[in-house]
């Protein structure tokens, strides 16, 4: 059984550029990356998740969720990952739940002024209005033995400086101690979770293809795993904000998604 730091596996990435500009002017559907810092027995985390679950399906659909579990609580959460711990430290997270939307801001705790159904929903319109999608992601994944691979293609609609990140999450993890089921659990990071630079910089609308791979742990269910690919864009204030992304199940595929 893989536990602790053994659960987070870092693998290789290759990059190639292609010149296709198909559909480059269509408006991409805007996903919001929701990074959750949590642990298994956190009561307030359950409450926060309840707020999320209470959203309409159309609202929930906007979110790409990654749950970075931490080695906290009694019994101690076994689903922690070393890169999730490092990111928690780097982002100075000290209270649970803490949620990050698009790596822009941290929202701490629950209730008024913190995580609530209303504040979660507001993140969608905030992202669409403040940082509209200028890129989109499509992907195809294969499974070769215990190696999961993904080819992710990004359509960039604007010149600029970008970063890309890829992580592997697992859904439907049933814990026999708490009788709970956990989803979107961070299992492996194929890049720095704050993104690796897209080089050379994007100077005109174009597509580029990126390849990542991860090793599926012995006690993970490959059929419940998915890659989450997210792309940062450098904004006018110098900050890198997640501009868009996609989730692709292992051995599955996902196409570009556009606004209707």
Where are the language model's segments positioned?
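Intrinsic low-complexity, intrinsically disordered segments enriched in polar/basic residues
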Residues: 20-26, 247-249
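Local sequence-structure signature of Cys/Sec-based thiol-disulfide redox active-site neighborhoods
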Residues: 23-69
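C-terminal edge beta-strand
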Residues: 11-19
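Residue-level preference for short coil/turn positions at secondary-structure junctions
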Residues: 3, 28-30, 95, 223
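Short, small-residue-biased leader/transition segments that mark boundaries at the very start
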Residues: 2-9
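The N-terminal extracellular segments of secreted preproproteins, especially immediately downstream
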Residues: 7, 41-44, 165
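Short, conserved sequence motifs used for protein processing/export or organelle targeting and
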Residues: 66-260
């Amino acid at each position: 059984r893989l536990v602790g730091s053994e659960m987070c596996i870092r693998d290789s990435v290759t990059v190639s550029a292609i010149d296709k500009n198909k559909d480059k002017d269509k408006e991409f559907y805007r996903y919001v990356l929701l990074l959750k810092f949590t642990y298994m027995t956190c009561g307030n985390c359950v409450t926060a998740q309840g707020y999320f679950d209470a959203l309409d399906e159309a609202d929930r659909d906007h979110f790409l969720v990654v749950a970075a579990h931490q080695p906290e609580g009694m019994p101690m959460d076994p689903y922690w990952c070393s890169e999730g711990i490092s990111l928690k430290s780097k982002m100075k997270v000290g209270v649970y739940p803490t949620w990050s939307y698009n790596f822009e801001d941290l929202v701490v705790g629950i209730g008024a002024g913190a995580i609530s159904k209303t504040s979660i929903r507001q993140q969608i319109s905030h992202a669409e209005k403040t940082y509209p999608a200028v890129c989109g992601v499509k992907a195809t994944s294969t499974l070769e033995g215990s190696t999961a691979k993904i080819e992710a293609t990004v359509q960039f609609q604007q010149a600029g400086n970008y970063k890309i990140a890829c992580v592997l999450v697992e859904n439907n993890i049933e814990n026999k101690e708490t009788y709970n089921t956990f989803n979107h659990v961070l299992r492996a990071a194929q890049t720095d979770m704050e993104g690796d630079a897209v080089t050379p910089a994007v100077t005109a609308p174009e597509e580029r293809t990126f390849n990542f791979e991860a090793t599926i742990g012995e006690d993970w269910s490959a059929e419940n795993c998915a890659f989450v690919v997210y792309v940062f864009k450098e904004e006018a204030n110098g900050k890198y904000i997640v501009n868009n992304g996609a989730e692709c199940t292992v051995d599955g595929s996902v196409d570009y998604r556009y606004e209707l």
